[in-house]
Amino acid sequence: MSFPDITPSLKATMPDLRGRLLANQSLAELTWFRVGGPAQVLFTPADEDDLAYFLAHLASDIPVYVVGVGSNLIVRDGGIAGVVIRLAPRAFGEASASGDIVTAGAAALDKRVAEVAASANIGGLEFYFGIPGTIGGALRMNAGANGGETKDVLIEARGVGRDGTKHVFSNADMKFVYRNSGVDPSIIFTSARFRGEVKDADAIRARMAEVQSHRETAQPIREKTGGSTFKNPPGHSAWKLVDAAGCRGLRVGGAQVSEMHCNFLINTGDATAHDIETLGETVRARVKANSGIELHWEIKRIGVS
């Protein structure tokens, strides 16, 4: 599927734009599942000012989506009408530490932020070492693992609104809840500051090694997967509910529930986005029938079928 090319008209209305605009760009290679259709427009801003300029001049009726490293995302097979914004690591991927503060761009890998903190003897951010995403996604979904969450360490976040206005959000402003934040979904996060605590370097490294070991032994990290598929319902582990419903190893087309960790869906090689989403919905239905508990997607799904 392809969409009408609107990049010439966008460029005409944005003469000072410095970032890159691409029409009908495939998104499959930008997601960990390696599935999905094209973006009508893929925009990579040069920096925060360029992002703000673009949004301020973009017609309000054009939908906008953000894609990071695509680790917790399904792009549907029909692609995405409108604009997909990808914050490139070169412009938004820096991470640095000073005292007990870590500053990171929204495109910085969570794992990289943990490493920068550890190099400065800053503890408290080790949990990021086991999360395969970026800081932008961590801010949006209050990412957490291994006993830590973004809400525990965030000082403030910067972002740009749909109208191009820049914003700064305190921890309280973020209105964090389990695997979500209360900030307007149209805000595109650009950077954040975190506070840890100065600790013994060996203790920090040991904790990070534990986190990595857990990932390697308990999760299918070498597969084409989107990470944790469903949120844990209060008082329950999603994977246990999926397992109890007899879904371990269940397949739809080229998509399969992981044998190693059944809260992970994997692309066995030739899956479509439809296969993966259908499998997820099948699992949800079986869990509901077996336990009466409704699972909610943790993976974001965007685009048209």
Swiss-Prot record:
GO annotation terms (biological process): cell division; cell wall organization; peptidoglycan biosynthetic process; regulation of cell shape
Keyword annotations from UniProtKB, A to Z: Cell cycle, Cell division, Cell shape, Cell wall biogenesis/degradation, Cytoplasm, FAD, Flavoprotein, NADP, Oxidoreductase, Peptidoglycan synthesis
Enzyme class: oxidoreductase
Record-annotated FAD-binding PCMH-type domain positions: 34-199
EC number: 1.3.1.98
Cofactor: FAD
Lineage: superkingdom: Bacteria
Chief site of localization: cytoplasm
Compartment(s) where it occurs, according to its Swiss-Prot or TrEMBL record: Cytoplasm
Known pathway: Cell wall biogenesis; peptidoglycan biosynthesis
InterPro entries the record matches: FAD-bd_PCMH, FAD-bd_PCMH-like_sf, FAD-bd_PCMH_sub1, FAD-bd_PCMH_sub2, MurB, MurB_C, MurB_C_sf, Oxid_FAD_bind_N
Entries under Pfam families matching the protein: FAD_binding_4, MurB_C
Catalysed reactions, semicolon-separated: UDP-N-acetyl-alpha-D-muramate + NADP(+) = UDP-N-acetyl-3-O-(1-carboxyvinyl)-alpha-D-glucosamine + NADPH + H(+)
Range of residues in the leader sequence: none
Residues annotated as catalytic: R179, S228, E298
UniProt GO cellular component terms: cytosol
Gene3D superfamilies in the cross-refs: 3.30.465.10, UDP-N-acetylenolpyruvoylglucosamine reductase, C-terminal domain, Uridine Diphospho-n-acetylenolpyruvylglucosamine Reductase, domain 2
GO terms, molecular function: FAD binding; flavin adenine dinucleotide binding; UDP-N-acetylmuramate dehydrogenase activity
Keyword tRNA-binding: no
NCBIfam families in the record: murB, PRK13905.1
Family per similarity comment: Belongs to the MurB family.
PANTHER family xrefs: UDP-N-ACETYLENOLPYRUVOYLGLUCOSAMINE REDUCTASE (PTHR21071:SF4)
Function: Cell wall formation.
Identification of the protein by name: UDP-N-acetylenolpyruvoylglucosamine reductase
Protein source organism: Bradyrhizobium diazoefficiens (strain JCM 10833 / BCRC 13528 / IAM 13628 / NBRC 14792 / USDA 110)
